[in-house]
């Protein structure tokens, strides 16, 4: 018996990986996070599968269901939105399974920030503009931010910054980014429900993005991207496909 932690992708059912889809279609048990999992993805579970929404469950209850499946010898597809390595509560589940001696595998998925970049038709690392992407979130009552990871500190590099789970706190976010070194005219883009049918995109700057988000009533399930890559045009071409590089290999 194996628990498969499967990255279900950002929303669109056809963005799950081929491996993830194959496992989902054969596992007799599926546990998923309810409000952010598309119905047409769950429809790919095999006939008669036990399908459980873990949204209302505690960690202890989730682990108990995994242990029950293990006792019955039934493989489990544990679906997480996006990629399991980001903001998925994967670590504590793996810790519990390790303690119980239950085997598991992790299947990567398309993360929300990648779907957001695709929606914006933008590369997040552009030569001469930014070669670093910082993925972060803001503090909540349940999840504090460790020392040194506050937004002002992260903003000092002025690299491309991607914020998850943060739309409702945009009024507090903007001043911290400005304090850290981003300019008021720094481009910002917001993608709500990236890859879902109801996907929406919004563009602005740090000076006006909060007002724009309020006007658009975007308060949840959104990725916020900050950085000059969003509007960069006169950048240097990548060396990867340059004449100099290919000429060297041709010699």
UniProtKB/Swiss-Prot annotation:
Keyword field contains S-adenosyl-L-methionine: yes
InterPro entries: 4pyrrol_Mease, 4pyrrol_Methylase_sf, 4pyrrole_Mease_sub1, 4pyrrole_Mease_sub2, Cbl_synth_CobM/CibF, Siro_Cobalamin_biosynth, Uropor_MeTrfase_CS
GO process terms (BP): cobalamin biosynthetic process; methylation
Domain of life, per lineage: Bacteria
Keywords associated with the record: Cobalamin biosynthesis, Methyltransferase, S-adenosyl-L-methionine, Transferase
RNA-binding keyword on record: no
PROSITE patterns according to UniProt: SUMT_1 (PS00839), SUMT_2 (PS00840)
Single annotated GO MF: precorrin-4 C11-methyltransferase activity
Enzymatic reactions: precorrin-4 + S-adenosyl-L-methionine = precorrin-5 + S-adenosyl-L-homocysteine
Root EC class: transferase
Pathway: Cofactor biosynthesis; adenosylcobalamin biosynthesis; cob(II)yrinate a,c-diamide from precorrin-2 (aerobic route): step 4/10
EC number(s) from the headed UniProt entry: 2.1.1.133
Family: Belongs to the precorrin methyltransferase family.
Protein name (Swiss-Prot/TrEMBL): Precorrin-4 C(11)-methyltransferase
Organism: Mycobacterium tuberculosis (strain CDC 1551 / Oshkosh)
Taxonomic lineage: Bacteria, Bacillati, Actinomycetota, Actinomycetes, Mycobacteriales
